Amino acid sequence: MIQMQSYLDVADNSGAKEVMCIKVLGGSKRRYARIGDIIKVTVKDAIPRGKVKKGEVYDAVVVRTRKGVRRADGSLIRFDGNAAVLLNNKQEPIGTRIFGPVTRELRSEKFMKIVSLAPEVL
């Protein structure tokens, strides 16, 4: 579960290393984001010649959480850390590569690009 002030790793090659959630999108009283939810983030740590700079604000989709996701068959998929993929204004990934596994829950029409770029889909 991601909330405001949560730090997340970045799972793409956009140039950001770490981001902080500043808003969970989708309703005025919405507190938590799960896998597949869109959040507003600010870049806290970035590499020198990346596509994004420290302090910039972007949308991001949550791809991994320590809380995990419960499947219909009762299984639970958990990860060691929280991670997100940065999105541009058209809700497309900024990076051209995705690092680490992503879950099948991202297989909606909006995020098929992320699923196809990911090295492993759980």
Swiss-Prot record:
The record's section on InterPro entries has: Ribosomal_uL14 (IPR000218), Ribosomal_uL14_bac-type (IPR005745), Ribosomal_uL14_CS (IPR019972), Ribosomal_uL14_sf (IPR036853)
GO function term, MF aspect, one: large ribosomal subunit rRNA binding
Q: Which GO terms describe its cellular component?
A: cytosolic large ribosomal subunit
Q: Which UniProt keywords apply?
A: Ribonucleoprotein, Ribosomal protein, RNA-binding, rRNA-binding
The record's section on Pfam families has: Ribosomal_L14
GO BP terms: namely: translation
What does the function comment of this entry state? Binds to 23S rRNA. Forms part of two intersubunit bridges in the 70S ribosome.
Family listed? Belongs to the universal ribosomal protein uL14 family.
HAMAP family the UniProt entry points to: Ribosomal_uL14
Q: How does it assemble?
A: Part of the 50S ribosomal subunit. Forms a cluster with proteins L3 and L19. In the 70S ribosome, L14 and L19 interact and together make contacts with the 16S rRNA in bridges B5 and B8.
NCBIfam families linked to this entry: rplN_bact
The entry's protein name is: Large ribosomal subunit protein uL14
- Gene source species: Xanthomonas oryzae pv. oryzae (strain KACC10331 / KXO85)
